[in-house]
Amino acid sequence: VAYELKGQNEYGFKIIGSYDPQLTLVIDPALSTLSAATYLGGTGNDRGFCLALDNSGHVYVAGYTLSSTADFPTTDGAYDRTYHGGYDLFVSRFSSDLKTLEASTYFGGAGTDYLYSMALDSAGYVYLAGATSSNDFPIISGAFQAVYQGGEYDGFVAKLSGDLSTLLASTFLGGSGTDQPASLILDSSFN
């Protein structure tokens, strides 16, 4: 990609070569200073899929992992510190300078769990959307859809506390086919 001036106070990018549109494109206009960076993961395949900042500057990263309980970093007080098998989801919170892992949890069941979207509201709650093949996926009592409906995957939507210690809401979302919600957007009422 190349940077281009499209008009007064209007900028854009033009594609100058082949690219994979499934990959995230990150562009740093300065390209001279790396402010902060860190690693997160264990010995298995770890895929960070979502990144978000809260109002205090904490950095949330979420994705899915094949790394076991023995080596993926979780924190005391986390909602779930146990790897359940297949790909499990993870959600982690770093300090704004990425020097401290403040909270980190697994989230998922014994099957394969994929995370596709994460959002934060102004109160600091963490919302997740993705797909699961886990019949034992963590669903709260009284959920909209408490039972896995079948197919290769059912979608799910979940809400965690900002400190990643408490599952506040979760539900399956799907029918008898394969259901994979691709994104999650909160409205002005955080619904």
Regions found by a protein language model. Give the residues of each.
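A generic structural signal for beta-strand entry/edge sites
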Residues: 8-12, 58, 88, 125, ...
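Hydrophobic strand positions within the blades of repeat-based beta-sheet folds
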Residues: 36-37, 51, 61-63, 77, ...
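Charged substrate-recognition surface patches at the periphery of nucleic-acid/ligand-binding domains
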Residues: 1-52, 58
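Short loop/turn motifs that cap or connect beta-strands within the blades
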Residues: 31-46, 100-112, 166-177
